Design a protein with these regions (language model features):
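Sec-dependent bacterial lipoprotein signal peptides
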Residues: 1-17
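Long, intrinsically disordered, low-complexity segments
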Residues: 18-20, 91, 103-106, 191, ...
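Membrane-proximal, proline-rich intrinsically disordered regions
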Residues: 19-66, 92-94, 330-348, 352, ...
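Conserved, well-structured interaction surfaces
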Residues: 41-48, 52-56, 78-160, 175-188, ...
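Short coil/turn linking the two alpha-helices of tandem helical-hairpin repeats
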Residues: 155-159, 164, 205, 236-245, ...
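Flexible, polar/acidic helix-loop-strand segments at domain edges
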Residues: 291, 345-424
Length: 564
């Protein structure tokens, strides 16, 4: 049965405005609440719809990822909507509303589950052999729905700042009269919700004895997902965009909550997966992947591969092409930056002895990718910028791509993809950032906590076989190293777009976008020359999204600064 369920008794209360409620009711609209509450599966369908509204970025902007609005990548199709983020073409009438809509959809469904379907008993199924198990899962829905509602509010606050806070099903009049509350109040709500439910929600769906669930249920929010949301939200709340007064106690709380995630994960037998690339392949959903805390799994598809396979492959679009900015961020295996004295970097053999994560993330000239064909991104090459929609940077994307995918018009295949939302490595990095900003040093642990920022970062670096962080760095030098580590470890996972905003450092990083010009010499050798391929400007109003103009009018929102 499909996921969307509508009931006429609630329809009038829920179809009110795009700023607060679900707009796209299509199925079962002749049925009422009594119809839905008769069966586990019908109430479960509402929960499924909540999870379906969790956003992922396998090319949300007609193939482009949010990273292509940053220094992470460039989308190879000129004129794509992603360019609006850096050419100033977005605004209240072109507001990039995807998450604005899906988050309110998810909040609406969450409120429906909590208000209307919180006390079902399913009497017709009491004799069913699975009744106890189904009721156990059903009683967990209230905690899943509260987690999801908090998650959707986090997605809103990190984009828009203050928004209306809607915590129950409402009439149209009530919804349209909701006040817009400050961002800090939204963060308080998220923190309180997560604190209230983290000890009540299921800890591990696969470890419940005779109540354990089949594999398909393990993608639901559990205790660690609740703790992870709370910790990430605390990090954002402590960051300059939302912490104008520089309140250091917020950094301490963020460190404490990230440490709690790490401790709980260890208790559950989790750790960093030895093979970084396995986090993003077609089998990443399997139980053996002990680093992923929560992910959004998609149906089988080859669209992401079609978007991002190199031009020159049948039916490929070229897609999100990693920048030289990103490639340069990968250190040498000796732990030195490529421009650091003693690094050993050879500009004419630029990918030799580099951090192993580079080869797992970026496809470079001369390697076989995605299959047996050698990638030719040199000037005039089969996969180069000289071909329509060929890479403008000299690189193609590897991360998240299932290289066994065939996208040809005949004989194609497809695989599921799993968009990683929370994974353990992030929380070592989050801890490091919070500890650094609280103590002012990369080498001092906050009171009552077990690690320094350097020690936390070293856990992530060890998996990549990179040396430990250097000692004796100043605050600014350590911060730069930390931001670089976060850039490479979390590349193309949806963080860069928001990290540069919450740090309020976008102008520093988003000015010159660089690529690699590769020229084949007469003797067959390659000449490598880094070059600036775009120079961009920044407007501080872009730190927050504009509210859609129609909702400013309908929902009494105050437009974000600079967008009026």
């Amino acid at each position: 049965m499909k996921a969307k369920y509508i009931f006429s008794g609630l329809l009038a209360m829920t179809l009110v405005s795009s700023c607060t409620d679900k707009m796209d009711y299509k199925e079962y609209n002749i049925y009422d609440k009594a119809y839905v509450e008769k069966m586990f599966g019908r109430v479960g369908g509402l929960m499924t719809e909540i999870y379906n509204d969790i956003d992922y970025d396998f090319g949300n902007y007609s193939g482009a990822m949010a990273g292509s609005a940053t220094d992470e990548s460039v989308y190879s199709h000129p004129g794509n909507a992603i360019e609006d983020f850096y050419n100033g073409a977005w605004g209240p009438t072109n507001a990039k509303e995807r998450v604005w809509k899906s988050a309110w959809d998810g909040i609406t469904y969450s409120n429906l589950v909590l208000d209307e379907f919180n006390d079902c008993t399913f009497p017709e199924y009491t004799e069913d052999e699975h009744y106890r198990q189904q009721m156990f899962l059903y009683k967990n829905y209230r905690y899943e729905a509260r987690w999801a509602r908090a998650f959707f509010y986090f997605e809103l606050v990190k984009r828009y700042g203050g928004v209306p806070l809607k915590t129950r099903t409402m009439t149209a009049t009530e919804a349209n009269s909701l006040p817009q509350v400050p961002a800090d109040s939204i963060f308080t709500f998220i923190d309180k919700e997560c604190a209230d439910i983290q000890d009540s929600i299921i800890v591990n769906y696969g470890d419940l004895g005779d109540m354990s669930f089949y594999k398909a249920q393990t993608g639901r929010a559990n205790k660690l997902a609740v703790m992870a949301l709370r910790a990430r939200a605390a990090l954002y709340r402590a960051s300059p965009l939302f912490n104008a007064n520089g309140d250091k106690s917020r950094w301490l709380k963020a460190a404490q909550l990230s440490n709690a995630v790490i401790a709980e994960a260890r208790q559950e037998g989790m750790g960093l997966l030895p093979d970084y690339s396995k986090l993003f392949d077609k089998d990443s959903y399997k139980d053996g992947i002990k680093e992923i805390i929560f992910a959004r799994r998609t149906a089988a598809s080859n669209a992401f591969e079609k978007y991002n396979y190199p031009i020159g492959i049948e039916n490929a679009d070229g897609g999100n092409c990693p920048t030289q900015n990103l490639v340069d961020a990968y250190e040498m295996t000796n732990g030195r930056a490529i421009d650091e004295q003693g690094s050993g970097y050879d500009p004419q053999d630029p990918y030799k002895d580099r951090d192993a994560r580079l080869a797992m993330t970026v496809a470079v000239n001369g390697e076989k990718w995605p299959d047996k064909d050698t990638l030719k991104t040199f000037e005039g090459g089969a996969n180069s910028s000289s071909v329509t929609y060929g890479t403008p940077t000299g690189y193609y994307l590897k991360k998240y791509i299932n290289k066994g995918t065939i996208i040809a018009k005949t004989g194609s295949n497809s695989f599921t993809h799993e968009w990683v939302i929370f994974r353990l490595a992030e929380f070592y990095l989050n801890y490091a950032e919070a500890a650094l900003n609280y103590t002012g040093s990369g080498y001092t642990a906050p009171e009552g906590l077990p690690m320094t920022a350097a020690q936390a970062i070293n856990v992530v670096r060890t998996r990549a076989k990179q040396p430990n962080m250097a000692t004796g760095l100043s605050f600014d030098a350590f911060k730069k190293k930390y931001e670089n580590e976060r850039f490479v470890e979390l590349a193309f996972e949806g963080h860069r777009f928001f990290d540069l905003r919450r740090w309020k450092e976008a102008p520093q990083y988003l000015k010159d976008i660089r690529g690699m010009k590769i020229t084949r010499q007469d003797d067959g050798t390659m000449k490598y020359e880094g070059q600036t391929i775009a120079t961009r400007t920044w407007d501080d109003k872009w730190y927050l999204f504009p509210f859609p103009q129609k909702d400013v009018l309908n929902c009494h929102l105050t437009q974000n600064e600079g967008w009026k």
